């Protein structure tokens, strides 16, 4: 399995460095992973590009929740994509759907055009489309580089049969990137059952910043109570262990 490419989901410069130290070949750079991953700052992208040599795919997602965007939101996505690519991102990850849950072909075409030959990745918005096989053909026709998917299940392990079908249907016309719940305990089975040549994983551990712990009654998340002490960071050792599992 040593030829399997490992992509790690990251949210900071430090995460990218740890992913590279652990043996990843590529990172998807986001912010706000607790919201499913949003567009990273230009500062984070620029400093990550300076810090690591591996491939960086910049997430282009302006807000949490669904993937049907207003005109203003889509304009922001276009500008963010242009800026990310100007900062030497190796590609962009995006997912744009219609209100009916289908691929928004015209808007996705514009995003692929903006990528201008660099990697254009359709992220896990694919996992909520109503007709995944039709969506796959549409993305192939658009010239999308890669589709990230859990097989429309809670994890790639659970969706392995569907992922295998996508790979069979794709027939090397587009890359299929299994994602969702992949770790060193599940990766071998996912690879065996899908026949994939790459995997995406989010391997994190808790870190703490106790500077806001003096007033526990204060929360910066509005009515949603969340920890103001803990946050997650990429676990370099977990990346290394997963990379080791791929070498077995």
Q: Each predicted region: which residue ranges?
A:
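Active-site-adjacent beta->alpha loops and helix N-cap segments on the catalytic face
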Residues: 14, 33-54, 72-75, 96-116, ...
